[in-house]
Design a protein with these regions (language model features):
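Bacterial N-terminal signal peptides that target proteins for export
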Residues: 2-13
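Core hydrophobic alpha-helical transmembrane segments of single-pass membrane proteins
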Residues: 14-18
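Sec/Tat signal peptide C-region and signal peptidase I cleavage site
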Residues: 19-27
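Sequence context surrounding c-type heme c attachment/ligation sites in exported
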Residues: 29-155
Length: 155
C-alpha cells in the first residue's frame, strides 16, 4: 500500500502534468484564435479595398489607410501571440484551416509573407486612385498565393 506522503506526491505530480497539458492545449488554441482573428481582420480590410477596386465604393485615401493600418495591427498582434509558430499545431483542440505544410522544411511561407508585407507597403505609398488601382492587385495576389498553398478548404 502506498504511504500517504507518496500518494500525495503522485497526486500532485499527476495534477501538474495534467495542468501542463491543459495549458499547452490552451496556448495552442489561443495561438490559433489569434491567427484566425488576423485572417478575419485581413478579410474585412480586403473587402473594403476590393470594393474601391471594383468601383463599388469611391476611392477614399482614409479608407485605404485604415484598412492597411488594420492589417498591420493584426499582423503585429498575431506575431506577438506567436500565432504562426509551429507550436500552434501541438495539442490544439479547435479547428484550423492552416495546413501543416506551412511549417515544413522548404516551406515558401516566409517568402509569401514578405510578398504580402511588400504589397501592403507599396499600396500604402500610393497617393491617388490610379496608384491604388495599379498597386492593389499585388496585394490580392499575395493573399491568394499563400492561401492556395497553405490554407485548407473551409467546410
Amino acid at each position: 500500500m502506498l504511504s500517504s506522503k507518496l500518494l500525495k506526491s503522485l497526486t500532485a505530480g499527476v495534477f501538474i502534468i495534467g495542468l501542463g497539458v491543459t495549458l499547452a492545449y490552451a496556448a495552442a488554441d489561443d495561438q490559433i484564435k489569434a491567427r484566425q482573428a488576423e485572417m478575419k481582420g485581413n478579410g474585412k480590410a480586403m473587402g473594403a479595398l476590393a470594393a474601391i477596386m471594383k468601383g463599388e465604393a469611391p476611392y477614399d485615401a482614409a479608407v485605404v489607410k485604415a484598412s492597411l493600418d488594420a492589417m498591420a495591427a493584426g499582423d503585429a498582434a498575431a506575431n506577438e501571440a506567436k500565432a504562426w509558430d509551429a507550436s500552434s499545431m501541438e495539442g490544439a483542440t479547435i479547428e484550423t484551416w492552416a495546413k501543416p505544410e506551412i511549417w515544413a522544411e522548404g516551406s515558401q511561407v516566409g517568402a509569401k509573407y514578405q510578398a504580402w508585407v511588400d504589397a501592403r507597403t507599396a499600396l500604402a505609398a500610393t497617393t491617388d486612385e490610379a496608384g491604388f488601382k495599379a498597386a492593389f492587385p499585388a496585394l490580392g495576389a499575395a493573399c491568394g498565393g499563400c492561401h492556395e498553398m497553405y490554407r485548407k478548404p473551409k467546410g
